[in-house]
From Swiss-Prot:
This is Homoserine O-succinyltransferase. Pfam families: Abhydrolase_1. Transfers a succinyl group from succinyl-CoA to L-homoserine, forming succinyl-L-homoserine. Homodimer. The record marks 324 as: Important for acyl-CoA specificity. GO terms for cellular component: cytoplasm.
Length: 385
């Protein structure tokens, strides 16, 4: 917790709730008759409502992207290193919006919410949601806030997929798209990782087919194992080696199945901590949304054809040691955009952190992001004049 709020922090922020009572048709064929989205804003919306930036979160992210909820907070929002006065996403220039997506477990309508038609928690009956559904709901939030066009939409990993979908679905509603450490669709290996994660949850005897709250239970073992698996894929081999190597907790082998290597202790801690803040049904939903995303399926697998609908400029960023969403996956998008005749910039950043590098304030990464968004801000100033 900070003794004093840093000068480059957005400070103490209060989440807001947007209630929607117009039904939202979902890709799965079901609909939500009503729902709510929790969100935070940083900075000030200008008179023409032209300086807004939307932040789209990754699998385990939420609406709390920057600042603090209270002075007692142990840490700031998940992307505080990038959002704030004078930072890469400069709140002196932009009005920044971050939300928790539908199906989430941090305040937006999801499996832990009450189904208004039954008066009971949704739990396993909450419908499958997709990236397309999220973007539709985000557009409704923009309407509510009086924002017709975003200056930029920014997202990393699964968040980057949402940005890509925005450029296709609502091409006139964003001027710039920033897609970081993402992909045009999941690889077979990534789908496999997600299935192992889901099976670890489903096979936990405390899962109760997704209705664990009604059974006064939580599938902590399964969810913790899913997080441990995911965490390994978010880090590079070099990063794990540098952090832990073969460090042990004892002077010699114990010849049992307890914790011996420091990396084992770390993974167990990460898994256990995750179960205290995240919902297993939400984790299942988020991984399915990842699996289903494939915009090129609309155009017989031709990514450049579907991206021809986009009208914004693009910035793509990848990281050299990211093997979950490798640089080659970003380059697929870049090449498709070039083929479609779109304006695109691309930066491959040297980084040791693996996929999680998109969350770190790596100097060249922050410079690339800041330079691109400064150009966006300057263009806004010129247009206002």
């Amino acid at each position: 917790m900070p003794d004093v709020i840093p000068a480059d922090s957005v400070g103490i922020v209060t989440p807001q709730i947007a209630q929607f009572d117009t039904p939202l048709a979902l890709s799965c064929g079901q609909s939500l008759s009503s729902y709510q989205l929790i969100y935070e804003t940083y900075g000030t919306l200008n008179q023409s409502a032209s300086n807004a930036i939307l932040i789209c979160h990754a699998l385990s992210g939420d609406h709390h992207a920057a600042g603090y909820h209270a002075m007692s907070d142990s840490k700031p929002g998940w992307w505080d290193t990038a959002i704030g006065p004078g930072k890469a996403i400069d709140t002196n220039k932009f009005f920044v919006i971050a939300l928790n997506n539908l199906g989430g477990c941090c305040g937006s309508t999801g499996p832990t919410s009450i189904n208004p038609e039954t008066g009971q928690r949704w739990e396993a009956s909450f419908p499958i949601v997709t990236v397309e559904d999220w973007v539709e709901s985000q557009a409704r939030l923009a309407d509510l806030l009086g924002i017709q066009t975003f200056a930029a939409i920014v997202g990393g990993s699964l968040g980057g997929m949402q940005v890509l979908e925005w450029s296709i679905r609502f091409p006139t509603r964003l001027q710039s798209a920033v897609i970081v450490a993402s992909a045009p669709k999941l690889s077979t290996q990534n789908i496999a990782f997600n299935e192992v994660a889901r099976q670890s949850i489903r096979r936990d005897p405390d899962f109760f087919d997704g209705n664990y709250i009604d059974n006064n239970s939580v599938p902590t073992n399964g969810l913790g194992l899913a997080r441990m698996l995911g965490h390994i894929t978010y880090l590079s081999d070099d990063a794990m080696g540098a952090k832990f190597g073969r460090q042990m907790r004892h002077d010699s082998y114990q010849y049992n199945y307890g914790i011996e290597f420091e990396v084992e202790s770390y993974l167990r801690y990460q898994g256990e901590a995750f179960t205290k803040r995240f919902d297993a049904n939400t984790y299942m939903l988020m991984t399915k949304a990842l699996d289903y995303f494939d915009p090129a399926s609309q155009t017989n697998g031709d990514l450049s054809a579907v991206l021809s609908r986009a009208q914004c400029e693009f910035l793509l960023v990848s990281f050299t040691t990211d093997w979950r969403f490798s640089p080659e996956r970003s380059e697929e998008i870049v090449n498709a955009l070039v083929k479609a005749g779109k304006s695109v910039s691309y930066a491959k950043i040297e980084a040791t952190e693996g996929h999680d590098a998109f969350l770190f304030p790596i100097p060249r990464y922050m410079t690339v992001l800041n330079t691109f968004l400064t150009r966006v801000a300057n263009r806004l100033t010129t247009e206002i004049k």
